[in-house]
Each structure stands twice: as C-alpha cells, then as structure tokens.
Amino acid sequence: MEAFVRETGRAVVIPNDNINTDIILPKQFLKNILKTGFGKDLFFDWRYNADGSLNEAFELNKPAHQGASILITGNDFGSGSSREHAVWALTDYGFRAVIGGGFSDIFYMNSTKNGLLPIVLPEENRKILRGIQADENIQIDLPEQTVTYKNYTFHFDINSQWKEKFINGEDDIDNTMKYEKLIAAFEKQRPNFG
C-alpha cells in the first residue's frame, strides 16, 4: 500500500447522498480480481451516455477535473453490497481520499485496507469545500488529522491503528509480517499433526 502522509491536490465534488457501490462500480465490472483497470468504469452509468459516449456534463469528465486526487461527496457514501472493487475503481482512477458526511461500515473498512483515506466531515465543513474551484487545491495532513482549504482548517478523526498503517504504507499482510519471528517461534512449539 502506498504511504499517505500528506496529500495536496485538486478535488472533484459529487455532492449526492446515498451513492452506493453499484453506482460507484456497476456489477458487470466485477469479473476481475486484479486491483487495476477499474478507473475507466468508475461511476459508469453517470459518466457515459446510453450510446457509450462521454456524458460531458458529469464532473469527472470535465477537463478541469482530470488528475484530481480528492473526492468530496455527500452522506452515506459506499452503501450497499460489500464491493471491494468499488474502492479499487476509486484508487485506480487516482483518488487518494474521499471526504464525505459518512460511509457505510463495510466501505469504510474496504477503503482503509486498500489505501483510500475516508474522511468524515460535518455538513458545514463540506459546504465550504464544495465551493472549491477546479484550479484550487485542498491539503490533507494525516499526522495532524486536518483538511485545509484556503484559510479554513477542519479536523477529522481516524482510528490510531489505521492512521499508522496509512502513514507507514502498510496493509494487513505487512502488519502481520511484523510478527513473523514470533509466529515462527510459536509454530515451533506446537506439535505437528501432519
């Protein structure tokens, strides 16, 4: 997992509430178990017209938003089925963080396990962030747990263990491997029933 300490980047605002995993990445794209190649299908039904052409009115398709690394959204983002692929689509597109009013528990956990930082901010903070222009940046400082835009700085909460994993760029396997010697010693003490 790529370390996340600070991110300064442009943001895309999709302020809708209740964006579920089927909207983020429709079911027809779940046939692959690789974590790459999903970015082009992110928000597929919103990004493309019925004839397959780009919906130029959709925020992700606007040239000014290309390369954005932060998504600002509404409440209850990522609800619906447990679809790790939805997180993969967001990260493959280039998003490093999603700022919302809340996330489904499963989506939140899938995000933390796959290097997408989910940040919960109240409506009054997100209302200010929704005013961001395409050429402006937001800075996320994970050690300080802050989001800064212009002269505004907002604090967010995150579990200390997840924070450490993000800062160190460690996934669950990396975390387990820290205990490799202890695990090996324990296994040597156990009888072999093989």
From Swiss-Prot:
Keywords: Amino-acid biosynthesis, Branched-chain amino acid biosynthesis, Leucine biosynthesis, Lyase. One of its GO terms (molecular function) is 3-isopropylmalate dehydratase activity. It comes from the Bacteria. GO terms for cellular component: 3-isopropylmalate dehydratase complex. It is an enzyme of class 4 (lyase). Pathway: Amino-acid biosynthesis; L-leucine biosynthesis; L-leucine from 3-methyl-2-oxobutanoate: step 2/4. Signal peptide: none annotated. Pfam families: Aconitase_C. It catalyses: (2R,3S)-3-isopropylmalate = (2S)-2-isopropylmalate. Belongs to the LeuD family. LeuD type 1 subfamily. Catalyzes the isomerization between 2-isopropylmalate and 3-isopropylmalate, via the formation of 2-isopropylmaleate. This is 3-isopropylmalate dehydratase small subunit. It comes from Leuconostoc mesenteroides subsp. mesenteroides (strain ATCC 8293 / DSM 20343 / BCRC 11652 / CCM 1803 / JCM 6124 / NCDO 523 / NBRC 100496 / NCIMB 8023 / NCTC 12954 / NRRL B-1118 / 37Y).
